[in-house]
C-alpha cells in the first residue's frame, strides 16, 4: 500500500484490496470481521468512516423470520458478502457502508457521499451518484447513474431510484422513482421531470416538456434525446 495515504489512527484490515492513490482519514475502519472489501484507485475517505461492517445477531435470534436471503448464516462469517468501491469516489466524514448479505454493497465510480450518510447492505450506486449530508438508504436499494439525493432523505429498503433523478431534502422515499424524475415530500412523490438537470445536459426545452408529460402519465413515450442519456 505504499502509494496510498492511511492516517495513523485509521484501521485497514490486512485482506482489504486497495488500489493506488487512495486517502483514508483519521479513525476510519475499513474491512475486518470476515468482510471482503475491494477499493479501486483515487478515492478519498474522510474521518470516522466505517466501510464493511457486517450485520450482527445475538445468540438465538430468529433471523429466518426477518431475512429473505437463503445463504445467510449468523455463525459463518464467510457467507457475508463484501463491499466494492470503484475509482474517484469521495466519502466525506462519518459515512457508513455496510457489507452485503446476498451480494456486495457497491459504489461505482465518481460518486460523492457527503458527511453522515448511511448505506445499508446490498445497495448499489451507479456512476456519478451524489448523496447530500445525512442521507440514509436502507438495504438492497439501487441508484441509477447521475442520481442526486437531497439532505436527510430516507429511503425504504429494496427501492430502485432511476438515473438522472433528483430527490428533495427531507424526503421519505417509500416507492420506486423512475428515470429523470423530480421527487420530494413525505412520503415522496414524483412531481415531474428533473428539468434543470436535463436542460443543463443540453436536452431541447420542448423535449424536456415532453419528458415531463411522460412522467405525469400524459404521453406514452420519452423523446429520443432523453432516452439517449441512458446509453
Model-derived features with residue positions:
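Conserved short hydrophobic patches within well-ordered secondary structure
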Residues: 12-16, 112-114, 164
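Surface-exposed loop/turn motifs in large extracellular/passenger domains
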Residues: 15-18, 35-39, 78-85
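A general structural signal for short secondary-structure junctions and capping/turn motifs
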Residues: 40-41, 86-87, 174
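N-terminal segments that cap or nucleate solenoid repeat domains
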Residues: 1-27, 33
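Glycine-rich hexapeptide-repeat left-handed beta-helix
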Residues: 2-5, 29-36, 44-81, 93-96, ...
Amino acid at each position: 500500500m505504499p502509494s496510498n495515504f492511511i492516517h495513523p489512527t485509521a484501521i485497514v484490515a490486512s485482506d482489504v484490496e486497495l488500489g493506488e492513490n487512495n486517502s483514508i482519514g483519521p479513525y476510519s475502519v475499513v474491512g475486518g470481521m470476515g468482510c471482503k472489501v475491494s477499493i479501486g484507485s483515487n478515492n478519498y475517505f474522510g474521518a470516522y468512516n466505517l466501510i464493511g461492517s457486517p450485520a450482527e445477531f445475538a445468540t438465538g435470534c430468529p433471523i429466518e423470520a426477518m431475512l429473505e436471503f437463503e445463504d445467510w448464516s449468523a455463525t459463518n462469517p464467510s457467507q457475508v458478502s463484501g463491499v466494492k468501491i470503484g475509482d474517484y469516489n469521495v466519502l466525506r466524514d462519518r459515512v457508513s457502508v455496510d457489507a452485503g448479505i446476498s451480494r456486495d454493497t457497491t459504489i461505482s465510480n465518481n460518486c460523492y457521499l457527503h458527511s453522515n450518510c448511511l448505506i445499508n447492505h446490498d445497495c448499489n450506486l451507479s456512476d456519478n451518484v451524489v448523496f447530500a449530508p445525512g442521507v440514509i438508504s436502507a438495504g438492497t436499494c439501487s441508484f441509477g447513474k447521475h442520481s442526486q439525493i437531497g439532505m436527510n432523505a430516507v429511503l425504504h429498503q429494496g427501492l430502485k431510484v432511476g438515473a438522472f433523478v433528483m430527490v428533495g431534502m427531507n424526503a421519505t422515499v417509500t416507492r420506486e422513482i423512475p428515470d429523470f424524475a423530480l421527487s420530494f415530500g413525505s412520503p415522496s412523490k414524483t412531481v415531474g421531470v428533473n428539468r434543470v438537470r436535463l436542460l443543463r445536459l443540453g436536452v431541447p426545452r420542448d423535449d424536456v416538456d415532453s419528458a415531463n408529460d411522460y412522467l405525469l402519465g400524459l404521453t406514452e413515450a420519452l423523446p429520443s434525446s432523453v432516452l439517449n442519456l441512458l446509453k
